[in-house]
C-alpha cells in the first residue's frame, strides 16, 4: 500500500489569557457560528492536474451533508454525490460517517455505498477534551495507524507521533499563537527524522484562515482564502486560490437550531 502521509492541522484555542490549549469544536473548524443543526456543502474544483489548471465546472464535484449536535460536534456526515462509475473507486469512497462522542472518547465509523466499513477511528481524550491517542483502522487496505499526542502548554506546541502498521513513523509539530490558532506546522517523515514539509498560517480579522504557505524541499505553494458570511458570521462561501489561481469553491447551505 502506498504510504499515507498524514498531516494533522487541528486548530486549537486558548482559554482567556492562560497558556492552556483547548480543543475547538467542529463548528470552529468549519468557520461556523451559532447553533448549527446541519450544513450542506457543495464543492466545486477548478483545481489542477499535474499543476495545469482546467476550466470552471458548473456542477458540484462533491456534495456533503454534515449533521451537528447542539454542542457543535459532528454526529453524521453523508456524501450526496452519486457513486463513481468505476466500481473499485466507488468501493473505496466514503458515503456515510457516524460519529459518537463521550467525555473521554470519540469514535468515527465510515461506510461505502454497499454498507461495508471502510475505516474506524477512535480518539482517547484527556479531561480537558484534548486528544491523547488516535487509532485509525482501514479495513480494505489492512492498515492501522496510531497517533500519540503530547502538549507543551507553556510554548503552545503539540507534538504528534505517528506509527503505521508496517513500522513506518512520522512526526508532526504544531505551534500556536496566543489566540490558539496554528501558525506553524512541521511535518517529518523517515521515522520522524526528515523534515518533509513546513507550513505557516495567517488569519483575517475574523480569525479565519487567510493564507497558508507550504514549503517543500524543492518547491513551495501559497494558498489564500476568501469568504462570504451570513448574518450569524458563518462562512457561506469559501474560495481557495493556489498561487493566485482559483482551485476550489465551497458553497454552504446552513440550517440553525
Where are these regions (language model features)?
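Buried hydrophobic residues that stabilize the cores of well-folded domains
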Residues: 18-257
Amino acid at each position: 500500500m502506498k504510504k499515507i502521509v498524514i498531516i494533522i492541522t487541528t486548530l486549537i484555542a486558548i482559554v482567556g489569557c492562560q497558556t492552556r490549549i483547548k480543543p475547538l469544536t467542529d463548528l470552529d473548524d468549519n468557520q461556523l457560528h451559532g447553533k448549527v443543526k446541519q450544513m450542506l456543502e457543495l464543492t466545486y474544483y477548478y483545481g489542477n492536474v499535474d499543476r495545469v489548471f482546467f476550466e470552471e465546472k458548473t456542477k458540484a464535484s462533491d456534495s456533503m451533508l454534515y449533521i451537528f449536535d447542539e454542542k457543535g460536534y459532528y454526529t453524521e456526515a453523508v456524501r450526496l454525490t452519486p457513486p463513481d462509475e468505476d466500481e473499485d473507486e466507488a468501493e473505496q469512497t466514503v458515503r456515510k460517517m457516524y460519529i459518537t462522542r463521550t467525555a473521554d472518547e470519540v469514535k468515527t465509523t465510515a461506510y461505502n455505498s454497499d454498507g461495508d466499513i471502510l475505516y474506524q477511528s477512535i480518539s482517547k481524550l484527556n479531561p480537558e477534551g484534548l486528544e491523547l491517542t488516535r487509532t485509525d483502522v482501514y479495513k480494505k487496505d489492512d492498515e492501522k495507524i496510531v497517533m500519540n499526542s503530547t502538549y507543551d502548554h507553556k510554548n503552545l506546541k503539540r507534538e504528534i507521533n505517528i506509527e503505521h502498521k508496517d513500522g513506518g513513523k512520522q512526526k508532526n509539530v504544531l505551534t500556536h499563537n496566543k489566540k490558539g490558532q496554528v501558525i506553524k506546522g512541521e511535518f517529518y517523515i523517515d521515522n520522524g527524522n526528515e523534515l518533509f514539509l513546513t507550513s505557516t498560517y495567517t488569519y483575517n480579522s475574523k480569525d479565519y484562515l487567510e493564507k497558508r504557505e507550504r514549503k517543500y524541499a524543492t518547491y513551495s505553494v501559497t494558498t489564500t482564502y476568501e469568504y462570504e458570511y451570513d448574518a450569524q458570521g458563518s462562512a457561506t462561501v469559501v474560495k481557495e486560490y493556489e498561487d493566485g489561481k482559483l482551485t476550489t469553491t465551497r458553497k454552504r447551505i446552513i440550517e440553525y437550531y
